[in-house]
Amino acid sequence: MIRLATKEDLTNIMLVYMKARKFMKDTGNPDQWGDNRPTYESVVTDIDQKRMYIIEEDEGLLGVFSLYDYDKDYENIDGKWLNDEPYVAIHKLAANGMKKGVFKKALDFAKSKSNNIRIDTHKHNKVMQLNIKRNKFSYVGRVYIDGELERLAYHLVV
């Protein structure tokens, strides 16, 4: 089941992000989220703006992600998006590590909202790149988060 996150979920969300940061470091990607990203404040903002989602099953919270219908960092791309149509962007995707399939569940949810899906990731995040490629996204160039943090940009038109 996928549902909107609430502030009651904050502790569990931040625990998932803590596990994800450790996993990223252990798999050769120490820089994407460092020690403190996503920040508590950015998670609260996403909850308040009703764009943070929880993936849960009988086992409890399996993963978390945000779904944006616009991202200012995507306005300037060193490359070219597949089209300029309205889109959704998957951000802050993380799993608790207990069960596979979190990426696919988030992607299927995004597909239910739009046929235009964008996502970005760090050049060292090989696990995310593999998930992106397995799901037929096209690499379209590079974007810069907050104008400076380089990310690989991908686009899927369903």
Functional labels for PLM-detected ranges:
Residues S112-H124:
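Conserved GNAT acetyl-CoA-binding A-motif
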Residues D120, S138-L152:
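Conserved catalytic-core motifs of GNAT/GCN5-like acyltransferases
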Residues I54, G60-D69:
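Conserved beta-strand in the GNAT
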Residues K22-E41:
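Conserved GNAT-fold acetyl-CoA-binding loop/helix
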Residues A95-S112, Q129-R134:
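Conserved acetyl-CoA-binding loop-helix of GNAT-fold acetyltransferases
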Residues M1-L15:
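A short beta-loop-alpha structural element at the N-terminal edge
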Residues S66-M98:
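Conserved acyl-donor/pantetheine-binding loop and adjacent beta-alpha core of acyl/acetyltransferases
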Residues S42-I54:
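A short helix-loop-beta-strand connector motif used in the catalytic cores of GNAT acetyltransferases and
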